[in-house]
Amino acid sequence: MMHAIEKLPRRRENAIPWLLAALFAQPALAFQTELADGTQVVSTTNISYGAQWRADNALKPLIGPAYGGVSGSSANDDGNLNYSRGDLVSSVFKIVSDVELKKGQYGALVRAKAWYDSALENRSVPHGNSVNGYTPGRLSDRGFVNEARFSGVSLLDAYAYGNFRLDQSDLTVRVGKQVLNWGESTFFQGLNQTSPLDIPALRRPGAQIKEALIPVETAYFNWVPQNSPVSVEGFYEWKFRPFVVDGCGTYFSTSDIGVDNSCGASANLGPAITYPDGSIGYMQRGNNIRAKNSGQYGLAMHYNAEAIDTQFGLYAMNLHSGIPIFSAYTSSFVHGPAQLNALKYLFEYPENVRRYGATLATNLPGGWSLGMELSHSPNSPAQINAVDMFYAAVGSGLGPLGASYPFTTPDGTYMRGFNRVRQSQLLVNTLKLLSPMWGATGGTFIAEFAYQRAGIDDPGKAGAVRYGRGFNYGANIAAVCPSTVPGQCSNSGYATPSAYGYRLFGQLNYATDIGVSVKPSIYFAHDLKGWSVDGQLNEKRRTLGVSVRFERAAYWAEASYVGYNRNATYDDGRDRAFYGISVGYTF
């Protein structure tokens, strides 16, 4: 199916089609044997090949003026400039394999993956990226984190577990690299933030859910008293692992100044900031600030009300944000180019984000299941608009931050790119396993609605700090406002106090006389109103994904298409539609 779960530095929202494909698509086949000492060995390996092509032309508002576009910045268009409609953007061979050992009440699991994208490794592109010096030819992934590279090997899960019978209770313990999934959310992120996302893995054709979630070094327990409706689970993570994002210059990247230090393209401040010698202002790359490894933990309690067939949950956790925040060091433009070395940008990961929540899961008449989740963070990091930061960082006095950083501010002053805000989210979802219909033997339908509220001012309020909105829209009505930049002369697109939207997914299963299962599916996402502080909701953004999958025994093949609403003005990825194919074998 398609590929994409709502979130990441402004592109995480396009991960959902991939995760749905991974979740509903993989045959459950495995090799099993038993050793002489009674140890059971279970292994599963999936070998696949997939390819993707660009389906739409690039939009001029997402390309810098130097290349014929009308964007407010030239720091976001490398992915667009490297690929035209119909171009091959990925051609990847993959192997994902896991082995589990079980004996009695103990066990261990190890999972790894390997991939080779021949298109990214060998195909010439016309523009390049900052890593290869913007030279036409092959892209370079030098300096990318391992998981974002064009080929590589990565260890995923690696943990040991034990199941223990205590005095009138059962205890399960797992220690090692593992994935946890808390809460009731299917598409949106709320309580399910214990495991970060590997975005490049999500985008690769034929992605499996095992590739999508990054295992974290964790000690986990689940305690279930006998004859009691209450259970308790908890975790402690001793290693910080951030999101993996698209490498600069690749098709899905919407920022040329990528999180990896190797993506060191200077951030153009725009023609409004000009030095005394007439040169244009730029920000150089600084060193990222990584979160500490310690201090991530959580506790949850569940109550199973059998009389009403409902489970309730209470959650509390303290995590470091895996989503990078853009921050800066100042340098007043009146000092001239000699002080440019002090003007820098960097990415950092805010620590100790507290989150609390309550959930409900129940079954309704007619075969429907219902899930609800209410989550709240009193100190969620919200990205301050980067363009407002640019103008303040050079002491221009422009924009809502200008007064806080006058031209007398010492060069090299740290400018934190986020504020801590209150953030609450309510989501409701439903799932139904479909009965035979339209010639199908059955199917699945899922719907989810989310409403988010944040403790921020309306962006149109005088003096309000503005959050979100990408580089492409340049300045704004409080600073410089060239009429050539669509969406610039407006307070739209900045994060709003409230936002809401929904997601739909449906799949039907057909059996044939030749033993081939055919599974057509459709995914639709619609962000109805507002822009959320975490980027999950972006007004007018719509995503449509359709696919058809064929399975016969251990073999499978799939064709898919994912498109976006090209009129969603403040969606930086609205022109990145694609279609793809993938084939695989599981043993």
Region annotations inferred by a language model:
Residues 31-43, 55-58, 99-108, 121, ...:
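Short loop/turn motifs that connect adjacent beta-strands in outer-membrane beta-barrel proteins
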Residues 41-49, 106-112, 171-173, 230-234, ...:
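Transmembrane beta-strands of outer-membrane beta-barrel proteins
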Residues 42, 94-98, 157-159, 218-220, ...:
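Membrane-embedded beta-strand positions in outer-membrane beta-barrel channels/transporters
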Residues 49-55, 105, 114-118, 177-181, ...:
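Transmembrane beta-strands of outer-membrane beta-barrel pores
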Residues 59-80, 121-144, 198-204, 248-285, ...:
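Solvent-exposed loop segments that connect transmembrane elements
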Residues 88-92, 304, 311, 316-324, ...:
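Detector for outer-membrane/organellar transmembrane beta-barrel domains
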Residues 102-258, 319, 501, 529, ...:
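Outer membrane beta-barrel
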Residues 574-587:
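Outer-membrane beta-barrel "beta-signal"
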